[in-house]
Amino acid sequence: MYDARQLYDHLQVAEQDEIPLRPDERLRAMNRPLLAWYEEHARILPWREEPQPYRVWISEIMLQQTRVEAVKPYFERFIKALPDAAALASVEDDRLMKLWEGLGYYNRARNLKKAAGIIMEQYGGRMPSEYEDLLKLPGIGSYTAGAVASIAFGEPVPAVDGNVLRVISRVMASREDILKASTKRWMEECLKETMPKERASHFNQGLIEIGAIVCVPNGQPKCAECPLASVCLAFKQGSTGEIPVKTPPKKRRIEERTVCILEHGDRVGIKKREDSGLLASLYELPNVEGHLKPEELAEAFGLLEGAVEKITPLPEAKHIFSHVEWRMIGYRVQLKKSIPQEFISAQKKELEQVYALPNAFGRYTKLIN
């Protein structure tokens, strides 16, 4: 097992305290003020009102890469439609994608369904209660396994996400790169050793909460409001703006695309993407690489000569993925005849009720009326 003492040796820094604390003492000194603060300041959130294992799991997956306020309505809609693992395991893929539409990172939803199938087959429809078993489910890493195990089952394991990495890095004045897996591993081991075993749920949620609303990123922490200020080395040293340290992200590839709203009466042409790759298996508005001129559209989208009634330019749009940035121009193409057979001819109301179109096309789907 990893020796958490390596962290303590590594983090010996110049103390500003009158009586210096050992690193493990500093972490233990957080516990009481953290728990007291959380009990008083915890936000009221729908998944906290009933912290059942399934609900905790769904909320934690949704909260990956997505803000709390944005998740709330999606969570309530999802739970209403798919209230348990049995419903999730049996839902049709298109229905699942529609429920997830707007949250992005659609592999999260696919992994939820895969995991639900395993829960039904191997665990009798009940969420596994132990960290190591949770870790075996698709889409669940150390953070999510720790969150579900501690919040839903009280297991004394840490849940270290980006918020916690930031808080602990500042408390310890650590200059370790928080994007390195090794940094996360030693932080997990250290917290596992020092966290209050009987209060694991509130401890983990409290750390996450402080990181979300007090110890915020980009050099703007609210130190005057922080219950950990008295033990925080970065605060004492005036280095909160420099911590945490993380590797600058790689530059995204720029990709130009042309998007078309193909219309005939109350119908719109859409396509289903390939089963693998970016936005796999989702529906999309017709689009091609490059920025095309109006006279190039018919050939690019396989439209017959004389099929176009009118072409109207639409506003430019941009969508950022983790590794690529789409810079789009758009056109509304009104057709004289029906939607070509190579496209799905969808009624406009079906775009709201049936087909899941990713946020990448949001600027243009809002213009369909």
What is each stretch, according to the model?
Residues 14-28, 32-33, 37-224, 228-237, ...:
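Catalytic cores of DNA base-excision repair glycosylases
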